[in-house]
Amino acid sequence: MKALMFGWEFPPHILGGLGTASYGLTKGMWECGDMDITFVIPRPHGDEDKHFANIIGASQVPVAWRDVNYDYVDQRIGKVMSPELYFRLRDHIYADFNYMRTNDLGCIEFSGRYPDNLLEEINNYSICAGVIARTIDCDVIHSHDWLTYPAGIHAKQVTGKPLVIHVHATDFDRSRGNVNPTVFAIEKDGMNNADHIITVSNLTRQTVIEKYGIDPAKVTTVHNAVTPLSQELLDIKANKSPKEKVVTFLGRITMQKGPEYFVE
């Protein structure tokens, strides 16, 4: 099976759990066998693990035609994308995007993070998804979290292939009920257009069903797995007194992770 996956982070360059979860799921799918996975991120660094997924950076996807030769492309982006793929993608530019701000290769620059103009980057990412979907053959499209739902929808419209969205969290979780209407609309659009929805917990599944009005038959919970510790880590001995008690909160100090509940 050929899967076209859209994500926003991929190890080792991560800002939260989204990239780690995306990595684990992708690796697990590949280990099942007979899987050909293309994973798209906004901006790769070149040191991503590529042995189980083909990494494509939206920053290297041309959306405006530029007359450049092989050697120049190799010099500019050869560390993260082959010139052959660049030229294949260039052959599938589907509209005139010369009005957009692009670089000398006709590509849109992405921060690869969560900048103030995040909504603009999400829209630009979906434009790149249109070029990728016209170039890369796939059997299923998989979008990780709300940032990539527009890209997944665009790819589905281009290919006619089924779209699965992966809800790692909703804006109700991130904001504790103080929902951003723009984010909510993007999430709802993704859920409505998806052929199936994966949630990371039964609580998130209920939120999707109750808050977004989604048919329960369309939503499946798939819990995140745990990577077994290496023997090197298992061999580490505790450096504390047997009577000493240590309580640890392991997580970002954000509202969503609930450190205040932990302290209370």
PLM segments and residue spans:
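Membrane-proximal helix-turn-helix segments that form the acceptor-binding/catalytic region
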Residues: G130-T135, Q157, N180-I197
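Carbohydrate-associated surface elements
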Residues: L203, A225
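Conserved donor-binding/catalytic core segment of Leloir-type glycosyltransferases
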Residues: I198, N239-V263
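Active-site proximal beta-strand in glycosyltransferases
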Residues: A3, V140-H142, Y149, I153-R174, ...
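A short, glycine/small-residue-rich beta-strand->loop->alpha-helix junction that serves as a flexible
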Residues: E9-A21, D47-K50, K257
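A conserved catalytic-core segment of Leloir-type glycosyltransferases
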Residues: C32-A133
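Nucleotide-sugar donor phosphate/pyrophosphate-binding loop at the beta->alpha transition
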Residues: L118-C128, K161-V164, F172-D189, P228
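Nucleotide-sugar donor-binding and catalytic loop/hinge architecture
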Residues: M1-K2, L229-V246
